[in-house]
């Protein structure tokens, strides 16, 4: 076997384990999410209190994402991911036994803090996958979370039959098993620091402020694209159940089918469509194509009066757009920063995304209530239009430097006998 083939196999093994970890993590998340509002109502929560319980996750993730990025840059991706998984396990345990609203709020906050490792996982991909394959690899990582979105609600339905404690305790158990799996099979990916090289020290919030104040810089522009795109997408997520309920009579039971439908669409598109589109058009054009799909999808939502036509012709445009926009943007971002700053840069991108996810539900539902059902979709299309203008001026990436691949751990080496498929 050639040295190049050996490197490729090592890269695939690491990516496979990371994808498995992300998949199981999302299953746990989706086990709990569908029952959360109903659990809160049983504890006599008001609608505003339910909203704060949901917001607690995004607020905690917003605070923790850059911190996790800095931790991963200094101590390694693997420790950050393991701590995040164990924090999620603790949060789900609290959720399972919560008998007051403040405990429910606490469980969501801790869960959000553990979920701030998303940027760490993306940095892990950038560490281990060659630049030409990063967009596809990030697409597979996103596909794993989409698969979790499909499987999680189904398991949650069965878990809820065990009582209110069922979903939380099963999710906690999955997180513990996931942490054990990652401990044995997920090797460290961070590039080793050269002897005598000083560790850069600056405020964790400095890069986020720098990106906010300098949107014309290449890296900052990509972070803004990611954040603005997330603002539009999260706006749809918040207002869609209200829109479908008022326009088509969809209720909380039938809305779950749409959640699964979106998960299946996202999974198929990211696995089947993303790679060929990036190969054919390149990452920059892929971002622009994704923006067009999102704009058309948002504008068509309020124009289609038949639920079946909406589901078949319009709803797929949004998963197509996000599947093309977000992985390609993240891939380009990873190719434009210093290797030692990957974790904190991905954390900054997640910070922008966290702000968007915190603001979007309030913004879109306020517009829905005060201006009418169509306006949230029009505003979302306008936001993506701004993203498109930013995307037009994305320049080419600098020439990549070789990425050293750490030797796989003993368990990962043993897995080579059963994992033979290279990264496509």
Would you name each region that the model predicts?
Residues 64-76, 269-283, 368:
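Helix-to-loop junctions at the C-terminal end of transmembrane segments
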Residues 44, 76, 97-102, 304-305:
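Helix-breaking motifs and short loop linkers at transmembrane-helix boundaries and internal kinks
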Residues 34-47, 239-254:
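Short amphipathic helix-loop junctions that connect adjacent transmembrane helices
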Residues 107-146:
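Cytoplasmic helix-loop-helix junction between adjacent transmembrane helices
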Residues 2-12, 187-224, 412-414, 420:
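Juxtamembrane intracellular "pre-TM" segments in multi-pass secondary transporters
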Residues 62-99:
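Conserved MFS/SLC helix-loop-helix module at the cytosolic interface between two early adjacent transmembrane helices
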Residues 141-184:
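Helix-loop-helix hairpin linking two adjacent transmembrane segments in secondary transporters
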Residues 284-329:
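C-terminal transmembrane helical hairpin of 12-TM major facilitator-type secondary transporters
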């Amino acid at each position: 076997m050639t040295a190049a083939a050996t490197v490729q196999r090592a890269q695939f093994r690491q990516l496979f384990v990371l994808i498995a970890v992300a998949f199981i993590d999302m299953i746990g998340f989706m086990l709990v999410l569908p029952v959360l509002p109903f659990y809160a109502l049983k504890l006599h929560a008001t609608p505003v209190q339910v909203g704060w319980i949901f917001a607690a996750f995004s607020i905690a993730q917003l605070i923790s994402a850059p911190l996790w990025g800095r931790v991963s840059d200094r101590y390694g991706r693997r420790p950050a991911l393991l701590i995040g998984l164990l924090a999620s396990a603790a949060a789900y345990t609290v959720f399972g036994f919560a008998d007051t609203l403040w405990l429910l709020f606490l469980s969501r906050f801790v869960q959000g803090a553990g979920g701030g490792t998303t940027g760490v996982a993306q940095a892990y991909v950038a560490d281990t996958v060659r630049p030409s394959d990063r967009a596809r690899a990030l697409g597979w990582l996103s596909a794993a979370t989409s698969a979790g979105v499909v499987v999680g609600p189904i398991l949650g339905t069965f878990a809820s039959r065990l009582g209110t404690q069922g979903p939380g305790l099963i999710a906690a158990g999955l997180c513990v098993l996931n942490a054990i799996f990652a401990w044995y099979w997920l090797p460290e990916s961070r590039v080793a620091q050269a002897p005598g090289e000083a560790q850069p020290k600056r405020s964790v919030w400095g890069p986020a402020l720098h990106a906010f104040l300098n949107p014309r810089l290449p890296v900052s522009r990509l972070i803004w694209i990611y954040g603005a795109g997330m603002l539009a997408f999260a706006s749809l997520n918040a207002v869609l159940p209200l829109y479908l309920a008022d326009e088509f009579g969809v209720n909380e039971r039938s809305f779950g089918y749409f959640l699964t439908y979106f998960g299946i669409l996202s999974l198929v598109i990211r696995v089947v469509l993303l790679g060929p589109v990036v190969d054919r058009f390149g990452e920059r054009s892929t971002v622009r194509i994704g923006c067009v799909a999102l704009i058309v999808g948002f504008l068509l939502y309020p124009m289609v009066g038949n639920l079946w036509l909406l589901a078949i012709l319009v709803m797929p445009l949004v998963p197509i757009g996000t599947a093309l926009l977000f992985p390609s943007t993240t891939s380009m971002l990873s190719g434009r920063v210093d290797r030692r700053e990957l974790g904190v840069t991905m954390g900054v991108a997640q910070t922008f995304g966290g702000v968007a996810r915190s603001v979007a539900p309030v913004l879109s539902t306020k517009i829905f209530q005060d201006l009418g059902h169509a306006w949230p979709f029009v505003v979302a299309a306008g936001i993506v239009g701004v993203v498109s203008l930013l995307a037009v001026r994305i320049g080419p990436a600098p020439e990549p430097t070789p990425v050293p691949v750490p030797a796989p751990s003993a368990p990962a080496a043993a897995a080579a006998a059963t994992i033979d498929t290279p990264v496509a």
